[in-house]
């Protein structure tokens, strides 16, 4: 188990740890229970090694793995909140940390399941629940999230939001988090190596475009099919990379994060204060700036009419290429 980054809690701000969790090979419910125990063990051991730790983050699919033949079956799904989250909550309370966890969630309405992330605070309370807005189609069968992009209070003056893997490829997701007040965006991922460069690029651009920190971590290792790149990354609000992990399973990437600095930039910057400037265009020439929306795609998306000019020619619009029958209920 290696480590990169800081070791001590800052006087202001907070110390975060991103766990490059080894991609789980999961064949049964017993394997899931094993991962839960391992995650809990990792919480306690990481806190022991970093006594000032306040936030620990586990990547997407760290609890239930990526067994695509079974991942939507009743045996593999969890209820959120439920027994699994209760165990995570107990561990967070015992170690006095905020924890970010990944769960494939049973749909309470009986439909297709959700890809869900939660944040638990040091009192053992679930303070944020997020369902992935943009499943990685056509590979993933999850239902698109219906909880929006919530924001919660975190350590060291932070306002936290979580996005999941493919979500981070959409600048609109990061902007939504910032627009709702987040100064730290956490991204948990289960990508294979084919998109590692794009993953790092978007972590930086999401930080820069919104003047917020991004804390991102991916699964690491080989599952017999794909290699997962790890590469935990902490980006400053100016888009620069503060800490970058490697491709090692079990590497712990730590960083001191200062949310107040992001807040100060949002209040004090003129040039490149783009999250404000978006809604106040040309405020030198027009006092207060132009407020009207000039963007066709924003209007069309809001009206449920979003359609790219080449949409009728797009070849892949369902999951049949990955064996998902059209209109078949995948929850069993």
UniProtKB/Swiss-Prot annotation:
Catalytic activity: formamide + H2O = formate + NH4(+)
GO biological process, any: putrescine biosynthetic process from arginine
Alphabetical UniProt keywords: Hydrolase
Transmembrane segments: none
One Pfam short name: CN_hydrolase
Keyword Transit peptide in annotation: no
Record-linked SUPFAM superfamilies: Carbon-nitrogen hydrolase
Catalytic residues in the record: 60, 132, 165
Purpose: Is an aliphatic amidase with a restricted substrate specificity, as it only hydrolyzes formamide.
NCBIfam families xref list: PRK13287.1
Protein name: Formamidase
Organism: Bacillus cereus (strain Q1)
